[in-house]
C-alpha cells in the first residue's frame, strides 16, 4: 500500500533518458519507464479534463527531456515529444511505482481495445 505522504530521497534519470528512478523515504524504490510516465501523465489533456481518460498511443520511443521541481510537492516532467504539462506529485509517483504492473496491463488492454475499434 502506498505511503500516505511519501517523500523522495533520490530522483535519477538514466543516461538513455528512458527510465526515471525514484527512491522514497519509506524504503520504496521504483524504476519508471518514460513511456509509462508519458501515457499516465496527470495532465488535464491526458486525464481529459475530468472525462474519460485519453488513451495515448505511439510513445514507445519517447524520452524524458527534462525534470523541473515544482514547490516541495511535485516534479514537472517534460518529454521529447513536446508534452510538458503534467505535474507528478510525490504521492502520484509513489502510487505509479507501486501499481505499475497493474497500470501497465490496463493500458495495454485499453490500447488493444482501441486498435480493435479502428
Which ranges hold each PLM region?
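Motif-centric detector for short Cys/His coordination patterns
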Residues: 1-118
Amino acid at each position: 500500500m502506498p505511503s500516505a505522504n511519501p517523500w523522495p530521497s533520490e530522483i535519477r534519470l538514466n543516461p538513455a533518458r528512458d527510465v526515471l528512478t525514484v527512491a522514497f523515504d519509506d524504503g520504496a524504490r521504483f524504476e519508471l519507464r518514460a513511456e509509462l510516465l508519458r501515457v499516465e501523465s496527470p495532465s488535464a489533456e491526458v486525464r481529459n479534463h475530468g472525462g474519460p481518460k485519453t488513451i495515448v498511443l505511439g510513445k514507445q520511443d519517447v524520452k524524458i527531456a527534462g525534470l523541473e521541481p515544482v514547490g516541495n510537492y511535485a516534479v514537472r516532467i517534460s518529454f521529447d515529444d513536446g508534452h510538458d504539462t503534467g505535474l507528478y506529485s510525490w504521492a502520484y509517483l509513489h502510487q505509479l511505482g507501486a501499481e505499475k504492473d497493474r497500470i501497465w496491463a490496463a493500458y495495454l488492454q485499453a490500447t488493444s481495445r482501441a486498435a480493435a475499434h479502428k
